[in-house]
Amino acid sequence: MNQMMTFLQTNGGELLYKTGEHLYISLIAVVLGIIVAVPLGVALTRMKKGAGAVIGFVNIVQTLPSLAILAFFIPLLGVGKVPAIVALFFYSVLPILRNTYTGIKGVNKNLLESGKGIGMTGWEQIRLVEIPLAIPIIMAGIRTSTIYLIGWATLASFIGGGGLGDYIFIGLNLYQPEYIIGGAVPVTILAIIIDYVLAVTERKVTPKGLQGMKEVS
């Protein structure tokens, strides 16, 4: 307990900075994942062939060890936040892509035909019919991806990306439990807070009649 108090007194200000840094790395990667995965998921629903291959490839990338992905980008991008964010971006794509694809494919075809009947263009059907109906599943994928990345972002310190992982690695290398706790506990709290915020957001953007839908696993 004394060691933990000493750690907090010594590193209190830096701990807040590291927490913000950790959140920044995670959220930038998730935002990039959303920008890529949602349009790609919609596009795949328009493909008669190839959708399974694309999702299968992303699945393979997801199974690669996190440290291997981080190490892969060192020769290409060096060390620091950029390679860490790029590596985390790759991990963010699968849950969002899979849920977007599944959510859009699950939209009732009769509704799409009705949209065509009143003169909707393809883009209008996506924007006004398909995305709103698929939003519970899409948001569930975003939520899953974000929580995963907050945990995986601890590995960013392996390549100089910063964040709360710095404390965990220092604690492991120097056998100082207070540093491990000082990094791990804020990560856990951060994940819980972000999960709650995203859960509230999910309820706000989901039409009331669709709020019973669950994430596709």
UniProtKB/Swiss-Prot annotation:
InterPro entries: ABC_transp_perm/SBD, MetI-like, MetI-like_sf. It is found in: Cell membrane. It comes from Bacillus subtilis (strain 168). Belongs to the binding-protein-dependent transport system permease family. CysTW subfamily. Gene3D superfamilies: MetI-like (1.10.3720.10). Keywords: Amino-acid transport, Cell membrane, Membrane, Transmembrane, Transmembrane helix, Transport. One of its GO terms (biological process) is amino acid transport. It is a multi-pass membrane protein. It comes from the Bacteria. Involved in a high affinity multicomponent binding-protein-dependent transport system for glycine betaine, carnitine and choline; probably responsible for the translocation of the substrate across the membrane. The keyword Membrane applies. The keyword Lyase does not apply. GO terms for cellular component: plasma membrane. The lineage of its organism: Bacteria, Bacillati, Bacillota, Bacilli, Bacillales. This is Glycine betaine/carnitine/choline transport system permease protein OpuCB. The complex is composed of two ATP-binding proteins (OpuCA), two transmembrane proteins (OpuCB and OpuCD) and a solute-binding protein (OpuCC). Residues 19-198 form the ABC transmembrane type-1 domain. Induction: Repressed by OpcR. It holds the Pfam family BPD_transp_1. SUPFAM superfamilies: MetI-like (SSF161098). The gene is opuCB. The chain crosses the membrane at residues 23-43, 52-74, 84-101, 128-148, 150-170, 180-200.
